[in-house]
């Protein structure tokens, strides 16, 4: 370990110095060079004759619902100061410059509830519901439309259990060829200065924690917002169901709303959805032809306080599946819907499923996924876990889905996650894989081309580097 690899890790390019150590056939499809002009032209060649209907409601009301949820989660899940959360968290679903329109803020610490009132008299509220996290309510409502569930954990005491199933780290010496001075330099560089707003950084080497850093008030058990890294967690839950025999990766997605006679959405496979290639029509900021005149469905699935699964499942098809790759929240919401359908269809408890069938198996004690008012996991971006728990999840993939000798994910599922999605490849953007992972197919990140990542807004990242046995997790305010 005498050389170092400089790697860009995270959506905002947080620089981390890492210590080095020794599908389908798309032939005949039009391709593009990845330019905006050609992306739009290529998509137009596949366009289906369906209508786009924008989300209902006023943008400011939606933004303020997002703000109430952000404050609730920041204060009652992560333990941030309310002013800190208001100034530094969640600007993409609740723009910071619109938070000034709130004329009254009430934070009820006993009820764990946030209420924000606007000049037109509309009040948006969000409340903590145990393991279902903070949930924003529809206008005029102060409760949710489901019975919150108590989720029990079946794990030994963390303080006496060795890593990775617990918190006790080995005190064995590292191999002599590992330059620990350079490791410390890498950790300092990766954590960055205060303006980087990093809250947690964990690096593991061959499954063992090589080093970690935390911000003020944050420790190894603090649940941190992951934003869209949650998508990869949702893809993992689908993988668990596939390993259990509930689903097959390439079966048509059994979405009830798609089962009408002649519905073309019946051709969409589960594997297409998790490649962000379903072709479902919405308006999303990452689209090359995003229409700013409408409030984005992509955000509405966070802030609409509707049945998010029903909303996503009733959007029409814009392109045939597996032809066009677009980063849209409908796909992870549809995958989350499939999790609920599969879990309940198999007679398992829905809200307990992530803990009992994934988290308990890999040592995760402090994770949760927030829901919409109907109790549906918002698997596109509202999971909270400590940095160490994201490292555990990354190591599950590094180990090809096997944990302590037991297979958790199907054989080859890590390959599916780390391979470039054919539709994205044909679009000239070799950046997205399967199971809602990002890939390094275009190179240029300073890490091996085989590396793949869970990514979330604001530089949230879990980077898996199989060739070097590394997993790097970075979480911070955004």
Predicted regions, residues:
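Active-site-proximal alpha-helical segments within enzyme catalytic domains
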Residues: 235, 276, 331-340, 381-402, ...
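Active-site helix/loop module of the DD-peptidase/beta-lactamase fold
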Residues: 244-281, 285, 314-318, 344-385
